[in-house]
UniProtKB/Swiss-Prot annotation:
The gene is MSBP1. GO terms for cellular component: endoplasmic reticulum; endosome membrane; Golgi apparatus; plasma membrane; plastid. Residues 178-200 have a biased composition (Polar residues). It comes from Arabidopsis thaliana (Mouse-ear cress). This is Membrane steroid-binding protein 1. The keyword Cell membrane applies. Induction: Not induced by phytohormones and strongly suppressed in darkness. One of its GO terms (molecular function) is steroid binding. Residues 174-220 are annotated as: Disordered. PANTHER family: MEMBRANE STEROID-BINDING PROTEIN 1 (PTHR10281:SF74), MEMBRANE-ASSOCIATED PROGESTERONE RECEPTOR COMPONENT-RELATED (PTHR10281).
């Protein structure tokens, strides 16, 4: 059946065009290619613009709106890990120098699968300063860093301050310097004096910036 149809088609092509089937289909393919090239020359430049605009509008309709930043206040490092992007219902947070920023709008970078996803849900100050992706550098501790690394960290902080909303701080145990205790003055002014008692006399040696004085008092 198929052979009979092909034979009939060959005879029709030869009868109407005088060409063999191979030549006929080759000429047909060339004509289509030439048509595509010529039609591209006369295409309106606004067609591509309109096409891109339609694609962009469709993409915006598919993406859910970014929620407004929510203040989380002072939280611990463990609590910050809940905002690493694994839960799409929660904001995407990241901290620099104990300051927490909402980076939800840059989920393509800091969300799961992004190039900086390792930093999400953490205070990765040291890793940002060193541009390191090692697990040991995912910490707020920047001790031992050089001036160039600290400058790089400062640049990151300025970028986050200008681009993202600050929503809280990280409470880290031991991150604050200890406050030196100040002793209260005593009411007895002779507390700082060194008193030495010898038979028949009492020697009181007062320490001061001035030359030391020795007071002798005979025992009554």
């Amino acid at each position: 059946m198929a052979l009979e149809l092909w034979q009939t088609l060959k005879e029709a092509i030869h009868a109407y065009t005088g060409l063999s089937p191979v030549v006929f289909f080759t000429a047909l393919a060339l004509a289509f290619a030439i048509y595509q090239v010529i039609s591209g020359w006369f295409a309106s430049p606004f067609d591509d613009v309109n096409r891109h605009q339609r694609a962009r509008s469709l993409a915006q309709e598919e993406e859910p709106p970014i929620p407004q930043p929510v203040q989380v206040g002072e939280i611990t490092e463990e609590e910050l890990k809940q905002y690493d992007g694994s839960d799409p219902q929660k904001p995407l947070l990241m901290a620099i120098k104990h300051q927490i920023y909402d980076v939800t709008q840059s989920r393509m970078f800091y969300g799961p699968g992004g190039p900086y996803a390792l930093f999400a849900g953490k205070d990765a100050s040291r890793a940002l300063a060193k541009m390191s992706f090692e697990e040991k550098d995912l910490t707020w501790d920047v001790s031992g860093l050089g001036p160039f690394e600290l400058d790089a960290l400062q640049d990151w902080e300025y970028k986050f301050m200008s681009k993202y909303a600050k929503v809280g701080t990280v409470k880290v145990a031991g991150s604050e310097p200890e406050t030196a205790s100040v002793s209260e003055p005593t009411e007895n002014v002779e507390q700082d004096a060194h008193v030495t008692t010898t038979p028949g006399k009492t020697v009181v040696d007062k320490s001061d910036d001035a030359p030391a004085e020795t007071v002798l008092k005979k025992e009554e």
